């Protein structure tokens, strides 16, 4: 199916992905590409509209950091955001200068000039009846002269041109960021742009995308066999369900139990995929192999490397038993692709692999199949539901690739893994029972390799400590510790201490990100 598309050109903003997510939320397909794509690429992409992102540079200093001229010659609407507004102004004959000081944070602007972009969109009105908008600014330059044909559509004292438009050509630009949640009516503005100004319908949704994705896989794979490293995480689980629906017996999954999984995770994966869905799954219990190589190792990075290396070894051994497999499937998702886009945006040039298959040797000689590479995480979850996966599996909290290996501080021992598994399961059970699981973005227990004195009954105990961690976040770039009810924390602590022999103290981590990271290692 040919979707109407929005082209987003990335000038290096930290929040460019948010633009794409907001557009996709409107059920409109879009793609992010580096700003320096060729004119031919822009024409062949055939967008219904173009969005120019923000960026860290100044248009009068960054030589060559401008949009392809074809963007303004296609005859389609264009929206410039922050730096995107400045390059639009400069390229079309206006002027941009330094503001003298950066404007960062909340700002109130007045909508002016009866623009189509802002029509009936306001947070409130002033005494004269003019529409006012609460927006988020992040800029050090400003437009000082409009290009021919443009008018001011938004302003405030510190930013006389907070928005501009050429309504005839449908070129719009704003100095603020409509994609961030701090701009209260930002979603409404982007919806107005893609639906009413660009004329896009709502033809991008996961239930309808299932058949399209299945056809893509069948066309790519044909009659050849595929191997997938199934971890039990959201991405690989959705890939497994999609490929099984598309190619059935041509798919073989390899599930490696490294001894660092959550409680009953191996059983749940086998039940869901092998027994309920009928997927061909090879279950490899490599606990002893992993634990043996982790013995005596305390450094977090060293542990990660060992766990990754041993996974590769186990997976390769199983792959060698499947000589007919021609494809390696991975759970690469769209943010991975964006982050590896490279170009002058200064982003990494190496594709970031799915954590379980990272570093698989090229000697496998397998072609790469990445059926989720166009999807954001929320879309992957929606696709999983559309494919019939259980809600509890699809909406599970993130789990690190090395598993409990980086939630056991210091040396990893099987005994520690068992204690942590049970404590973590109690925490998650109680969060679910209290309807707090879906209110938190990530929650887990951490094993601390220290002992503390306690009293149980009439006896003294000297046992281990577990820390509980729960955070709320929209993007995992920053996070706030979840303010769980004290009664809930008390119940979790009481259960862990009474039910998990070997733990006599439970603490709660109230660190935000920054300065702390979400995971402890």
UniProtKB/Swiss-Prot annotation:
Signal peptide: none
Residues of the GMPS ATP-PPase domain: 204-396
UniProt entry tagged with the keyword Ligase: yes
Amino acids binding ATP: 231-237
GO molecular function: ATP binding; GMP synthase activity
Domain of life: Bacteria
Domain called Glutamine amidotransferase type-1: residue spans: 5-203
Cellular-component GO terms for this entry: cytosol
Pathway: Purine metabolism; GMP biosynthesis; GMP from XMP (L-Gln route): step 1/1
Active site: 82, 177, 179
UniProt-listed HAMAP family: GMP_synthase (MF_00344)
Biological role: Catalyzes the synthesis of GMP from XMP.
Name under which the protein is recorded: GMP synthase [glutamine-hydrolyzing]
Taxonomic source organism: Aromatoleum aromaticum (strain DSM 19018 / LMG 30748 / EbN1) (Azoarcus sp. (strain EbN1))
Gene: guaA
């Amino acid at each position: 199916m040919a979707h109407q598309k929005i082209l987003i050109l990335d000038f290096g903003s930290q929040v460019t992905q948010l633009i794409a997510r907001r557009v996709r939320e409107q059920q409109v397909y879009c793609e992010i590409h580096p700003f320096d794509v060729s004119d031919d690429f822009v024409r062949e992409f055939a967008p219904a509209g173009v969005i120019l992102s923000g960026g860290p540079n100044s248009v009068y200093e960054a030589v060559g950091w401008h949009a392809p001229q074809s963007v303004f010659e296609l005859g389609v609407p264009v929206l410039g955001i922050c730096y995107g507004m400045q390059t639009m102004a400069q390229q079309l004959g206006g002027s941009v200068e330094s503001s003298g000081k950066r404007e960062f944070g909340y700002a109130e602007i007045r909508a002016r000039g009866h623009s189509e972009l802002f029509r009936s969109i306001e947070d409130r009105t002033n005494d004269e009846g003019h529409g006012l908008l609460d927006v988020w600014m992040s800029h050090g330059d400003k437009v000082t002269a409009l290009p021919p044909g443009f008018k001011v559509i938004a302003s405030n004292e510190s930013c006389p041109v907070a928005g501009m438009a050429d309504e005839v050509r449908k070129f719009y630009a704003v100095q603020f960021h409509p994609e961030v949640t701090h701009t209260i009516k930002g979603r409404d503005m982007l919806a107005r742009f893609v639906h009413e100004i660009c004329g896009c319908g709502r033809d991008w949704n996961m239930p309808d995308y299932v058949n399209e994705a299945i056809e893509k896989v069948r066309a790519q794979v044909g009659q050849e066999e595929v191997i997938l490293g199934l971890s039990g995480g959201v991405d690989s689980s959705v890939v497994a369900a999609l490929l099984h629906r598309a190619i059935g017996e041509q798919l073989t999954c390899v599930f490696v139990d490294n001894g660092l999984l959550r409680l009953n995770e191996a059983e749940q994966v086998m039940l869901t995929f092998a027994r309920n869905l009928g997927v061909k799954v090879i279950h490899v219990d490599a606990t002893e192999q992993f634990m043996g190589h982790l013995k005596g190792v305390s450094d977090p990075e060293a542990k990660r490397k060992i766990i990754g290396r041993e996974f590769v070894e186990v997976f390769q051994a199983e792959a060698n038993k499947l000589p007919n497999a021609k494809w390696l499937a991975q759970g690469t998702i769209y943010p991975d692709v964006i982050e590896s886009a490279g170009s002058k945006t200064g982003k990494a040039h190496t594709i970031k692999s799915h954590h379980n298959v990272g570093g698989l040797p090229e000697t496998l000689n397998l072609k790469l199949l990445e059926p989720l590479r166009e999807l954001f995480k929320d879309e992957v979850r929606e696709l999983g539901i559309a494919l019939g996966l259980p809600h509890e599996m699809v909406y599970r909290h993130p789990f690190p690739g090395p598993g409990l290996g980086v939630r056991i501080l210091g040396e990893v021992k099987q005994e520690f893994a068992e204690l942590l598994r049970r404590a973590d399961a109690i925490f998650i059970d109680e969060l679910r029972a209290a309807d707090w699981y879906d209110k938190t973005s990530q929650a887990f227990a951490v094993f601390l390799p220290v002992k503390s004195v306690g009293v149980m009954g009439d006896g003294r105990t000297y046992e281990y400590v577990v820390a509980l961690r729960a955070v709320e976040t929209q993007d995992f770039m920053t996070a706030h510790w979840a303010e769980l009810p004290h009664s809930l924390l008390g119940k979790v602590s009481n259960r862990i201490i009474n039910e998990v022999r070997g733990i006599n103290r439970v603490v709660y981590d109230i660190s935000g990100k920054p300065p702390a990271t979400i995971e402890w290692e």
